[in-house]
Amino acid sequence: MENTIVIKLGGVASDNLTEGFFRQITEWQAANKKIVLVHGGGHYITKMMEALAIPVETKNGLRITNKAALEVTKMVLIGQVQPAITTAFQKRNISVIGLNAGDTGLLEADRLSDTDLGLVGKITKVKTNLIEQLLSENIITVIAPLGINSEHDWLNVNADTAACEVASALHAEALYLLTDVPGVKNGSEIINEIATAEIEKLQKTGVIKGGMIPKLASAAFAAENGVDQVIITNSLETIGTKIKSKVAIG
């Protein structure tokens, strides 16, 4: 969809919702840009799981999700994080609506082949009609990263992956993956640009590790599937690291 910008809010979503953030959103809307947000919630999910004495485990930067963890994830994302985000927009008189996989089967998903991860899925289809209808009315959509499979079972989905799938399905002009660091670092230095062909090498050499591994894999997917600009940063006001779809030289 022309003039669409997708933003993935970080695990501590409230950290991203600064006055500068809303100022940029307002400027984009004034320029007829359409805004879609996909939010994480890992920090709050972990806190709730610890409070309920549910073990917190990860593998390759992804949360291992059993039935108890999935119920907590749904509760926190839909009942806590998403309403906090939409309320922040409403306080500034910005039209917004929260959506999840239960809304007309918005995000269809299949379970990942790595069964060690449990009830974790990958988006297979984004039903864009509802999103596009809301965007045409200048309503910002805020989407929780949960999917539903063909048997109507809910699945936890990595928020970066969900944001990239949504951006690709909408043919967004830009995707911002907001995180807790100002870009991809090599030591203490921010890398300005990374070609998708360089990502595997950066992972093997240890430059990319932990949660940045699935984040960059998702960013590469978006860059190679129709999203013009893919940027990893901690703020809409920070340049961050641009992920480009091109072959590395040398």
UniProtKB/Swiss-Prot annotation:
Stretches assigned to coiled coil: none
This protein's GO CC annotations: cytoplasm
A single GO molecular function term of this UniProt record: ATP binding
Binding site for substrate: 41-42, 63, 156
A GO BP annotation: arginine biosynthetic process via ornithine
EC number: 2.7.2.8
InterPro entries hit by this protein: AceGlu_kinase-like_sf (IPR036393), AcgluKinase_fam (IPR004662), ArgB (IPR037528), Asp/Glu/Uridylate_kinase (IPR001048)
Chief site of localization: cytoplasm
Subcellular location field: Cytoplasm
Top-level EC class: transferase
Keywords on record: Amino-acid biosynthesis, Arginine biosynthesis, ATP-binding, Cytoplasm, Kinase, Nucleotide-binding, Transferase
Site (Transition state stabilizer): 8, 215
CDD domains: AAK_NAGK-like
Pathway the protein takes part in: Amino-acid biosynthesis; L-arginine biosynthesis; N(2)-acetyl-L-ornithine from L-glutamate: step 2/4
Catalytic activity: N-acetyl-L-glutamate + ATP = N-acetyl-L-glutamyl 5-phosphate + ADP
Protein family membership: Belongs to the acetylglutamate kinase family. ArgB subfamily.
Function: Catalyzes the ATP-dependent phosphorylation of N-acetyl-L-glutamate.
NCBIfam families named in the record: argB
Name of this protein: Acetylglutamate kinase
